[in-house]
Structure formats: C-alpha cells, structure tokens
C-alpha cells in the first residue's frame, strides 16, 4: 500500500465520530417488590431498631417523614431480614459484611430488571450494545456490578465497561454526561446506562446526637433505572430518540466543603449533612443555568422543562423561590419523590421516564411537557452539581 492511500489522522478521527447529538433511545425502571408507606414508617422504624423508648426522637422523625412529601418507598430489606441481622438496626455496629452480602447480589439484579425493560423498548438485539456504564453508591466489589450485569444480560464479552462506585446523588447527571461523550465520539455506539441503588448499605438505627443520619433514614429508597443512549438513530429499524442531550457540565459549589459526606466503614455507609444544602444549591443554581443556556439565548427558566434530583423537598422549594419557577415546573420531580422517595442516582432517570409518559398521555406537542428545551440537575456530595441541557422530541 502506498502512503498516499493511507487516510490522514483527521479523516480517521472524523470517521470515528458520530454526526448528530446523543439521544436517549429507551428508558426502563425497576423497584424491589417490598415497600413501606411513609405515614407508617416511623412506628415501623423505631420498633424494628428497638428504639421505642426514644419518644422525643421518634416525634422528630415523624415530623421529618411528614415533611418529606413522600407517600411510599421501595426497600429490598424486609422486617424478617432485619430481625436476623440486628447489627444493621443499631446506630453504629459492625455490619458491613451483612450489607455487602445483599448489595453485591441485588444491585446487579435490580439493574438487570431495569435494563431488560430498556432493551425491550429500544427493540434492537442486545449484541448491538457497545458500552456499559454502571453506577451505584451501594457497596463495592471486584469484578464489579458492571461485570455481573454483563453476565446476567448475556452481553458480548467485548462490551466496553465503566463502573462508577460511591458517587452519590449527583451521579444520575454524571452517567448521562459520560454516555453523551461515548455516543458522540464513537460512531454507531449504543451505550447501556444503569443506575441501581439499594439502601441496605445505609439503613441504621437512630441516634439522638446525629439527626443528619435520621434525615437519610426518612428519605432514601431503592430503585434502578436504565437507558440506551446513542447518536444518529437508525430510523429504518425503528430507533427514535425520546430526548437529545445538547451539553453537559459539572461543577463544585463554592464554600460547600463537607456539606454532604458519606463514609464506607465497618458499620456500613454513614451519611452526614453538615451545612445548609438547600441554601447552597439555590444560591448557586442560576450560575449553572446561565452558563448552560446563554449560548442558546435562553434566560426564562419557566420556558424550560425541569428534571431536578429531589434530594429533599426543601431543595426543590428553595430553587423554585430563588428562580421564580411556576409550581408545575417541578411536577414530574415531585411526583417521583412522592411515589418512590430519594433513590440517589436513579431519581433523575425515573423523572425522565415520568415526564415522557405524562407528556404522551396529556397529548402535548413534545416529550418535554410540550416545551422544546429542558434542564436536568444532579446534586450530591461535594457539593457537586451536574447540569445537562436536554432537547425534547415531537410526539
């Protein structure tokens, strides 16, 4: 072969890249069958943790649960299991092995349930999946949950895997940002994205000196969500985007060190809230919006559809006030919070699913509540904020 026939690096690079933006081609969700009703949870929680003598603390916990706006939460861990593992019911007792035994098995399993639904909606053979991004804050293992899911689904051994452990609640935005870069930089790539979260790693009894831990016990829940992400959808086989991803950014908020911490210890994953998280987020959120939407000439935040990680109702309330958002902007977000609780990284993907389903049911013009442009926010330890600009698709 003569040198002149060899393509230039520029030509090779161009051929490797996709032409269009990354799109979300399918969404699937899954939850454990077991669930708790939030109004009944304080009685159950203080009984199962042998803490009924802590009457003042129980009243505080009741108020937390009442204010949470949550109706029900799915949880893999049942009363029977907790009775057999009393160390998990103490505030600080060595219990990591018992927790790991659950999550190492159940995190990939719940992820599989969501992935099977997403693959079915996508309608293509799973052999077309080129990349897998798996995210969980529940446990760690080698080989990881990404490997286990590859085996459970029967994906090709050559699928390119990325395992994200211990990121926390912002990571639903992170996986979208990564999937976008993978899909747009690898022509024909189809990325399976899975977030699977199980609270077996964080469940613990109450402590009257650590109310921040109780906040987590009032909010956290189990769930998994899966997406197929790809650029240049093949309409001849029925591929069609639900949303397109236009840009994605990540930032650490100023003066927020230690606002949310999680530490994996012998006692499981401990959770600490040390600062005014709703205040820090609401104070800084407009800067992220300006940076994301100035290039598009958009400055009316009510003209966007909204998908925000529902860390807790106070975060949503303060963001609404700070930005002057109409009440209906957070409808999909609040619906997921009410029906599922805070499923960490999986939440924003559940909200995407809720929004496209409700938009279709209501007969509006687009997958984004009839609007063209939208924003997805992930908030979590750091404080880290993920901002994804979304473009809806006509229905």
From Swiss-Prot:
Belongs to the thiolase-like superfamily. Chalcone/stilbene synthases family. The keyword Acyltransferase applies. The primary product of this enzyme is 4,2',4',6'-tetrahydroxychalcone (also termed naringenin-chalcone or chalcone) which can under specific conditions spontaneously isomerize into naringenin. PROSITE patterns: CHALCONE_SYNTH. It comes from Cardamine amara (Large bitter-cress). PANTHER family: CHALCONE SYNTHASE, HYDROXYMETHYLGLUTARYL-COA SYNTHASE. The keyword Acetylation applies. The modification N-acetylvaline is found at residue 2. One of its GO terms (molecular function) is naringenin-chalcone synthase activity. It catalyses: (E)-4-coumaroyl-CoA + 3 malonyl-CoA + 3 H(+) = 2',4,4',6'-tetrahydroxychalcone + 3 CO2 + 4 CoA. Keywords: Acetylation, Acyltransferase, Flavonoid biosynthesis, Transferase. The gene is CHS. This is Chalcone synthase. It is an enzyme of class 2 (transferase). Its EC number is 2.3.1.74. InterPro entries: Chalcone/stilbene_synt_C, Chalcone/stilbene_synt_N, Chalcone/stilbene_synthase_AS, Polyketide_synthase_type-III, Thiolase-like. Pathway: Secondary metabolite biosynthesis; flavonoid biosynthesis. The active site is at 169. One of its GO terms (biological process) is polyketide biosynthetic process.
